[in-house]
């Protein structure tokens, strides 16, 4: 973990990442200054746009880099024929899996923390509080843990790093774009059925994707959008979701959507981590929870 954080590759990634953010921030500040000179007005929304842009870049980075970092963590050891050696040590299997995940999380944490100075520019004119930053970091942390646990799971189950990486990305795409596609299809089918006995206006008000809408609770992109929209947007995700997926009901889940989604995603991550530990366990478990024998996989 320490060696990786001091590598030239890590420094290059930090340099490129922060150079892009700094360039965007400078361009944003320049456009605000030019607008003041021209119209004598300050568009404070541009600072919120900068905050949204930086946060979105971090989210996309977590969504697609974390699976790549973790998908080869266990399968790579198996390919180098060092996994059996690690299994003979006194290290707990849980600690080994969590250590692999933590190593990747630290890399992403360094990138996220390095972007704080650019995000802090929004504090100059207000609109975002420290509580908002904390909520954003919590959302990013859950996304990183979930996508990282997906990579760890496939890395433990599959023998080849290439296959585990592909499966990890397919799962991430299924959680994000897949849940949206399923809900969009269900809403279109419900809308077509409603049009057969109601006017177009009433049909659009009645139709919805039904219970499938709750699949969005496992969608990291929807969770992030809900958080960032509440901080720098309208604060109501229904304005964007209802025209695409139908009416969302008023209940305890929709009222606390962000909390419910983050909790469920953490539970899913824990299940995947537990499954990864089980997958690399050499032998069967006895009633005390310890493995018997040294059955090589």
Which sequence ranges carry the predicted segments?
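Hydrophobic alpha-helical interface/terminus motif in multipass membrane transporters
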Residues: 74, 86, 121-122, 154, ...
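Hydrophobic/aromatic residues in alpha-helical transmembrane segments
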Residues: 66-70, 118, 149-150, 276
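Short juxtamembrane and helix-loop transition motifs at transmembrane-helix boundaries
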Residues: 97-100, 125-134
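Transmembrane alpha-helical segments and their membrane-interface loop/helix boundaries
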Residues: 1-60, 128-132, 143-297
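Short helix-to-coil transition segments within interhelical loops
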Residues: 85-93
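Hydrophobic residues within alpha-helical transmembrane segments
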Residues: 16, 102, 106, 110, ...
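Long, hydrophobic alpha-helical segments
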Residues: 50-76, 80
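Selective transmembrane-helix segments that form parts of the transport pathway or gating/packing helices
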Residues: 58-62, 66, 93-122
């Amino acid at each position: 973990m320490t060696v990786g954080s001091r590598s030239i590759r890590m420094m290059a990634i930090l340099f490129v990442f922060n150079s892009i953010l700094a360039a965007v921030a400078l361009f944003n500040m320049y456009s605000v200054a030019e607008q003041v000179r021209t119209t004598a007005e300050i568009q404070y929304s541009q600072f919120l746009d900068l905050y949204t842009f930086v946060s979105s870049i971090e989210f996309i980075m977590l969504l697609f880099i974390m699976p790549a970092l973790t998908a080869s963590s266990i399968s790579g050891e198996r390919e180098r024929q060092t996994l059996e050696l690690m299994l003979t040590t006194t290290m707990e299997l849980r600690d080994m899996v969590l250590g692999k995940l933590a190593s990747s999380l630290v890399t992403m944490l360094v990138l996220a923390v390095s972007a704080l100075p650019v995000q802090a520019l929004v504090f100059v004119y207000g609109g975002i509080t420290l509580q908002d930053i904390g909520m954003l970091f919590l959302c990013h942390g859950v996304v990183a843990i979930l996508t990282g646990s997906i990579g760890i799971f496939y890395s433990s189950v599959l023998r080849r790093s290439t296959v585990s990486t592909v499966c990890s990305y397919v799962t991430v795409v299924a959680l994000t774009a897949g849940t949206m596609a399923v809900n969009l299809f269900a809403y279109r089918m419900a809308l077509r059925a409603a049009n057969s006995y109601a006017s177009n206006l009433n049909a659009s008000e009645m139709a919805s994707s039904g219970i499938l809408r709750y699949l969005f609770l496992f969608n990291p992109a929807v969770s992030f959008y809900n958080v960032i929209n509440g901080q720098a947007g309208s604060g109501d995700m229904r304005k964007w979701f209802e025209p695409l997926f139908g009416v969302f009901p008023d209940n305890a889940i929709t009222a606390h959507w962000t909390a419910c989604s983050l909790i469920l995603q953490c539970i899913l991550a824990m299940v995947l981590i537990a499954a990864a530990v089980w997958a690399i366990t050499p032998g069967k478990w006895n009633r005390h929870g310890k493995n018997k024998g040294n059955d090589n996989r």
